[in-house]
Regions:
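S-adenosylmethionine
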Residues: 71, 75-76, 80-218
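SAM-dependent Rossmann-like transferase core, predominantly class I methyltransferases
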Residues: 1-73, 77-89, 215
Length: 219
């Protein structure tokens, strides 16, 4: 229905959606809320901090990046996606909603060297194993982009590992990584992050009481 209407609500705003991007989910709103809880603090007018550097990897419709750009005070937001079509939709949403986001065409699995540093890296990457597709709704399989949904059965953490390794190189001291995950593999994600040297790893449940979100800090 959302593709027919061409829109979906997310965090109090209406986003344009087409078949080239995932439909924003309520679960992902909870991920954004977690970040805002942690970082949306009042700014002292006498000593304004440097803008909070935020990177959203796999932005799709731009719902995460745009919401953070509009809601978090004094932030500078960049967003990557492998799909040029998705970036066109995301840019349109940002323009319509009045958000300043730097969108870039980038593959999370083959990230080029970057000298940028980030305070926050957030991602809701593909995390559904191919073997799980039989249990999924037919309308999802027919209309939503498979590249944004599925990972190989033998490598379910491929995006999480690549992004966590990027974070090791580009997160500022005390910088934080936020993931939406497949509840079936969230313990493996936690172990991977610990093995890479992340600390203060926290898990959070979604509205269905499933462990879905991970937060980890690089000290």
């Amino acid at each position: 229905m959302q593709y027919v209407l061409g829109r979906e609500n997310f965090a109090g705003r209406t986003f344009h959606v087409e078949s080239g991007v995932l439909i924003p989910r309520p679960e992902t709103e909870m991920l954004v809320q977690w970040i805002e809880e942690d970082y949306n603090t009042p700014i002292c007018g006498l000593l304004p901090p440097a803008p909070l550097q935020i990177l959203d990897i796999g932005t799709g419709s731009g719902c995460i990046a745009i919401t953070l750009a509009l809601d978090i005070l004094n932030s500078s937001v960049a967003a990557w996606d492998i799909s040029g079509d998705a970036l066109l939709i995301a840019r349109d949403n940002a323009l319509r909603l009045g958000a300043k986001v730097n969108f870039q065409l980038q593959d999370a699995l083959s990230i080029e060297a970057t000298d940028r540093c980030w305070d926050i890296i957030v991602s809701n990457p593909p995390y559904i194993c191919e073997k799980e597709c039989e249990a999924m709704a037919e309308n999802v399989l027919q209309h939503e982009p498979h590249t944004a949904l599925f990972v190989p059965n033998d490598d379910p953490l491929r995006f999480y590992t690549a992004i966590a390794k990027l974070g090791k190189k580009t997160l500022t001291k005390g910088g934080t990584l936020y993931f939406e995950t497949n509840p079936l593999y969230i313990k493996e994600v936690k172990t991977m992050l610990k093995d890479l040297g992340y600390t203060m790893i926290q898990l959070r449940k979604d509205q269905y009481d499933k462990q879905r979100f991970v937060k980890a800090t690089l000290l």
